[in-house]
A protein has these predicted regions:
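N-terminal amphipathic/basic-hydrophobic helices that include classical n-h-c signal peptides
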Residues: 1-21
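Alpha-helical membrane-inserting segments
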Residues: 54, 58, 62, 83, ...
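Juxtamembrane/interfacial segments around transmembrane helices
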Residues: 96-107, 125-135, 142, 178-181, ...
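Alpha-helical membrane segments and adjacent membrane-interface helices in multi-pass membrane proteins
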Residues: 62-137
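Short helix-perturbing small/polar motifs within transmembrane alpha-helices
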Residues: 23-37, 43, 49, 57, ...
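Hydrophobic transmembrane alpha-helices
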Residues: 16-93
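Hydrophobic alpha-helical transmembrane segments
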Residues: 45-50, 78-82, 93-98, 125-130, ...
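Membrane-embedded alpha-helical hairpins and interfacial helices in multi-pass inner-membrane proteins
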Residues: 69, 146-219
Length: 219
């Protein structure tokens, strides 16, 4: 039995054709949003993992200063500054926490002059290593809050280095029981090198941000 008006109600309704799916527009939008979030989360994880491996690679570019000091000359500190400046405070912190976990688990990510693993974390250079997450966080935090110029990047790097050496020298003091000896072993040999690292980190980070801004403006 046909009810009057049924034909009018059905007018304009087209059944799905071959190859089409009857998925509503809101559902498609939800799926698209979910997919986009998954891709973004994957990208963020990849950045954090890649940053931890970058620091591990730089840790192997090391010059031993034994028997003068157990603390080696390495570009690892420069890598940590760059991770904080370029990835930002939160991702930089996460990357350095992952780096410490990798090292504590026995992966060869620490500088090769030490024994590796937990032993190296608890050794004379452990204070520097344990400070890395805070160093990366602080560098990123200061750099994020400003014009992201060379001067701000240099300031962020300097403050981060102060935290790094405060942690490192405090840990060395536990071993030496002497502030003078801790400073001799952990600071005196590295002042000039750290100034160069600060300048390099600031130059790279500020230049990178300018390139990012130009790229976004061109889109």
């Amino acid at each position: 039995m046909r009810v009057e008006g049924d034909d009018q109600a059905l007018t304009g309704i087209r059944p799905p054709q071959i190859g089409e799916t009857a998925v509503s527009k809101p559902t498609t939008q939800v799926l698209s949003t979910s997919y986009g979030r998954t891709i973004e989360a994957t990208r963020q994880v990849a950045l954090v993992v890649g940053a931890s491996l970058f620091v591990a690679l730089c840790a192997h570019i090391t010059i031993s200063l034994m028997p003068l000091t157990p603390v080696p000359l390495t570009v690892q500190n420069l890598a940590v500054l760059l991770v904080g400046l370029l990835l930002g405070s939160r991702r930089g912190f996460a990357a350095m926490m992952l780096y410490l976990i990798e090292g504590a688990a026995g992966f060869p990510v620490f500088n090769p002059t030490g024994p590796g693993g937990i032993v190296q974390l608890l050794g004379p250079t452990g204070g520097f290593l344990i400070a890395y997450p805070i160093v990366a966080f602080l560098a990123g935090y200061v750099f994020e809050r400003g014009t992201r110029s060379f001067l701000r990047a240099a300031t962020a790097s300097l403050l981060a280095e102060i935290v790094l050496f405060t942690g490192g020298l405090t840990w060395l003091y536990v071993f030496t029981h002497s502030l003078a000896k801790a400073a001799y072993l952990g600071l005196n040999f590295f002042i000039a090198a750290e100034v160069i690292k600060i300048m390099l980190a600031a130059g790279i980070a500020s230049r990178w941000r300018k390139l990012e801004e130009r790229f976004r403006a061109a889109e």
